[in-house]
């Protein structure tokens, strides 16, 4: 597997830009940790810096077709679906001035017919080649509280802006043609498929899956997931690891929010990983997100347990498809903790 070369990057820019740079650009792989192993194996994001340094581009390169396995709805979105959703998000954000500059990539072009299909986008602000992007999850602990709070606040504002993009149908792109309008029906289908695939892959025992399906029936009977009137654009895996900061001005700035396009879907905003107790969402993040907060009642905490279970299963199933030594201990712990908590979790 060869990475994107400066020569390839220059050709991509020359294909899609009216005035492409003539000098060879600088290309750096955007390092993602604690992310979906199958998405990381299938798609690689690269930062492309041009001289003179007026714009920084983001090229998402597809290395292989995502294997679907026994749970096709948990597989990464196609690159065409990713571009369609990213474009819809950009159109939505452009429809009105945001309260603060939002760090989402701005789509430029899709080439699904290239030997290695790609999405070309640009960063909303200039990023010098010397700037180092670091994940918020990696640097937050070393920041002064006021700086960490400022970054979390902006993260919350950006999440709310993303979730304000809504749809008439629920689920990932493969379900669009079915026009499902009930989030409860949609999520039940997603999690049941994941549970059955986890049992087949020896990720979960038959006994545990049967018990969880019983808990799910109880939740459905209590209409636990039926409070989502209009589904929002959520990315499932977006947390502090999706937020990239830089300190080019001497103070950490939120430079890029890269939601996992591979798992974008329309559903419950609470599905976003940023709201998982395992992420320890800060007061500043929730303040930036605004009202209504994602969790108010006990039943919403139970919903988040189900979403943690689903997140963990999707990651473990993805790791199984990729093979090799994948760091998914956190996902296994998430599944086990959710399994235990859901046994007695209230649905009312």
Task: Annotate each language-model stretch with its function.
Residues 269-295, 308-326, 333-342:
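Active-site activation/catalytic loop segments of kinase-like enzymes and analogous catalytic loops
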Residues 32-185, 193:
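ATP-binding pocket architecture of kinase catalytic cores
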Residues 2-3, 32, 48, 61-72, ...:
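Membrane-proximal envelope and lipid/glycan-remodeling enzymes
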Residues 229-233, 245-305:
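Active-site Asp-x-Gly
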Residues 51-56, 83, 119, 166-189, ...:
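Intrinsically disordered, low-complexity segments that are common in secreted/host-exposed effector
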Residues 9-24, 109-113, 119, 141-149, ...:
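An alpha-helical support segment within catalytic cores of ATP-dependent transferases
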Residues 23-35:
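Conserved N-terminal boundary motif of the eukaryotic protein kinase catalytic domain
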Residues 1-26, 340-348:
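Regulatory N- and C-terminal appendages and interdomain linkers associated
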């Amino acid at each position: 597997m060869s990475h994107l070369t400066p020569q390839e990057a220059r050709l991509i820019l020359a294909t899609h830009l009216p005035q492409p740079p003539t000098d060879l650009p600088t290309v750096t792989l955007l390092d993602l940790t604690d992310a979906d192993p199958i998405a990381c194996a299938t798609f690689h994001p690269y930062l492309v810096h041009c001289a003179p340094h007026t714009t920084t581009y983001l090229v998402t390169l597809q290395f292989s077709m995502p294997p679907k396995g026994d749970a096709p709805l948990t597989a990464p979105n196609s690159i065409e679906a990713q571009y369609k959703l990213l474009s819809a998000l950009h159109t939505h954000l452009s429809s009105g001035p945001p309260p603060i500059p939002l760090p989402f990539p701005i789509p430029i072009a899709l080439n699904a017919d290239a030997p290695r299909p790609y999405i070309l986008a640009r960063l909303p602000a200039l990023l010098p080649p010397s700037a180092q992007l670091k994940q918020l999850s990696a640097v937050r602990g070393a920041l002064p509280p006021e700086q960490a709070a400022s970054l979390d606040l902006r993260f919350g504002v950006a999440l709310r802006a993303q979730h304000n993009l809504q749809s008439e149908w629920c689920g990932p792109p493969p379900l669009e043609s079915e026009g499902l309008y009930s989030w409860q029906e949609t999520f039940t289908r997603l999690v049941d498929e994941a549970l059955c695939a986890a049992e087949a892959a020896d990720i979960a025992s038959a006994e545990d899956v049967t018990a969880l399906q019983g808990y799910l029936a109880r939740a459905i009977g209590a209409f636990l997931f039926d409070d989502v009137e209009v589904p929002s654009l959520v990315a499932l895996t977006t947390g502090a690891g999706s937020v990239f900061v830089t300190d080019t001005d001497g103070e950490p700035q939120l430079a890029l929010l890269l939601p996992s396009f591979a798992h974008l879907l329309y559903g419950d905003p609470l599905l976003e990983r940023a709201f998982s107790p395992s992420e320890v969402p800060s007061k500043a993040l929730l303040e930036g997100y605004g009202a209504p907060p994602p969790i108010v009642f006990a039943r919403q905490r139970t919903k988040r347990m189900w979403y943690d279970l689903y997140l963990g299963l999707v990651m473990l199933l993805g790791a199984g498809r990729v093979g090799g030594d994948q760091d998914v201990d956190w996902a296994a712990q998430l599944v086990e903790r959710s399994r235990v908590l859901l046994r007695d979790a209230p649905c009312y």
